[in-house]
Regions:
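Catalytic core regions of nucleotide second-messenger enzymes
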Residues: 71-74, 102-117
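Catalytic-core segments of nucleotide cyclases and related cyclic-nucleotide turnover enzymes
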Residues: 9, 91, 95, 109, ...
Length: 163
């Protein structure tokens, strides 16, 4: 499984959406956010925040299938493309990912600081493009971070039966 640049991620997501539409297979995306990444960068420098993001990406990779893809759509965010995953499978992956990532702590100034991880889930529907799918996952992650600002949470769009 490779980490993708923003442009490669966009291309891969477009390909998977086209395949999902053509073949009728499901597709989900997870957006993993580190809510306190800007604070880490401001207080301890960009190097520490980059190291934290790289560590989260590495831990995330170990929870995924070989053909799932990870990319960085925005600051403090990692997007996971889950080809063939429907809503319930996406929720299972999101919860597993969150369980693993919520225990991560990063060392700064001799102290181990927790990362505020949120995971948002979006399931592709006919007529939804890549930007909208990412926006749905981002909105779900934002809802999750509002629910548990000091720890981690997972949320999915209302279409999957979650608030």
């Amino acid at each position: 499984m490779d980490s993708l640049s923003a442009s490669e991620l966009s291309e891969r997501l477009r390909e998977e959406i086209n395949r999902a539409g053509r073949e009728g297979v499901p597709l989900c995306c997870l957006l993993v956010t580190i809510g306190n990444i800007e604070e880490l960068s401001r207080e301890h420098g960009r190097e520490l925040s980059n190291r934290a993001l790289a560590y989260v990406a590495s831990a995330l990779r170990r929870q995924l299938r070989d053909f799932d893809r990870i990319g960085r759509p925005g600051e403090g965010e990692l997007l996971v493309v889950l080809p063939g995953a429907d809503g319930p499978r996406g929720e299972t992956v999101a919860r597993r990912v969150l369980d693993r990532l919520r225990s991560i702590k990063i060392e700064a100034d001799g102290k181990r600081r927790p990362l505020c991880i949120s995971v948002g889930l979006a399931a592709w529907r006919e007529g939804v493009d890549g930007e909208e799918l990412i926006a749905q996952a981002r909105a779900a992650a934002q809802r999750a971070s509002g629910e548990v600002p000091s720890g981690g949470a997972t949320a999915s769009p209302p279409a999957l039966g979650r608030p």
